[in-house]
């Protein structure tokens, strides 16, 4: 949506390099994964239209081609010197790019998988949010993450202590990701709250997070101090954000490449009571996003103190 890519011709605008700088994440990682005789450079990011403080590092479907190699490197990097540059390369690329644009916060939109790329991104992050839908699959995902994340944490701690990885061109960073919270999204509201069918799933998610997920995270040091959550103004066992389905607004948002709450009446192409209803929804969505943002900012400020 941000890039406005409509066909193969426009998609070429984020392929390869420009003036020696990579144009997407895969090209940015290529020096490490393809053993090129050059160091990783900052990616040439795209500025988000209408926001001079927001930049996008384009993704690339070809990043999946590095998944197997990265997985091998993360399992055997302690003994295979030839692979030692890979585990630390992703965070190095992110830091290098962030520094070139004076970026304060980096948000990573991860795919719903438990592969090596996500393991690496998670293990080298500072905070993580878990998106959920009020459905069966998310309730199962809670149990899956309860077992997987502690294992990833143990691997990351071991990797950070390996001399081989610390002597690499891109040293593996010592990080301890902390649970920032979770988001429940895409439910159908009725009278401003989830309908009874969706509320049943929301209740199950809250129960799973509070009684299964969070205790497991506490045991392996993946939770922030209780005082930090209090400073943020929320309980980590409750959703930091509950976001209803955007319905028809999302189509207009994508068409005009603006957030749903910034769509104008002309862009909505509606009149009368239909327009009033859409604008009321826009105001509600904006309020929800702002409240969640304030919670996150207060929490990060409390961490920095």
Show which residues each predicted segment covers:
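P-loop NTP-binding core
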Residues: 1-305
């Amino acid at each position: 949506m941000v890039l406005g890519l409509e066909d193969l011709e426009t998609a070429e605008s984020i392929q390869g390099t420009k003036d020696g700088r990579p144009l997407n994440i895969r090209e940015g990682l290529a020096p490490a994964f393809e053993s090129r005789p050059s160091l990783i450079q900052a990616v040439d990011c795209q500025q988000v239209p209408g926001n001079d403080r927001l930049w996008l590092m384009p993704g690339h479907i070809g990043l999946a081609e590095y998944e197997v190699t990265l997985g091998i490197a993360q399992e055997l990097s302690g003994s295979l010197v030839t692979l030692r540059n890979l585990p630390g390369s992703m965070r190095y690329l992110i830091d290098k790019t962030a520094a070139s644009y004076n970026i304060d916060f980096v948000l990573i939109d991860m795919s719903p998988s438990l592969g090596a790329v996500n393991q690496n991104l998670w293990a080298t992050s500072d905070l993580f949010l878990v998106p959920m839908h009020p459905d069966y699959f998310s309730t199962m995902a809670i149990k899956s993450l309860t077992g997987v994340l502690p294992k990833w944490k143990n691997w990351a701690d071991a990797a950070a202590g390996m001399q081989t990885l610390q002597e690499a061109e891109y040293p593996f960073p010592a990080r301890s990701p902390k649970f920032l919270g979770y988001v429940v999204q895409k439910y159908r509201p009725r009278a401003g709250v989830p309908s009874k069918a969706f509320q049943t799933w929301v209740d199950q998610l809250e129960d799973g997070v509070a009684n299964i997920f969070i205790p497991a995270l506490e045991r392996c040091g993946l939770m922030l101090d209780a005082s930090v959550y209090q400073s943020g103004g929320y309980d980590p066992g409750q959703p930091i954000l509950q976001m209803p389905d955007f319905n028809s607004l999302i189509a207009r948002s994508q068409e005009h490449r603006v957030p749903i709450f910034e769509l104008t009446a002309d862009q909505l192409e509606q009149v009368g009571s239909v327009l009033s209803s859409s604008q009321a929804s826009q105001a509600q969505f904006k309020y929800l996003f702002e409240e969640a943002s304030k919670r996150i900012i207060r929490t990060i400020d409390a961490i920095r103190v």
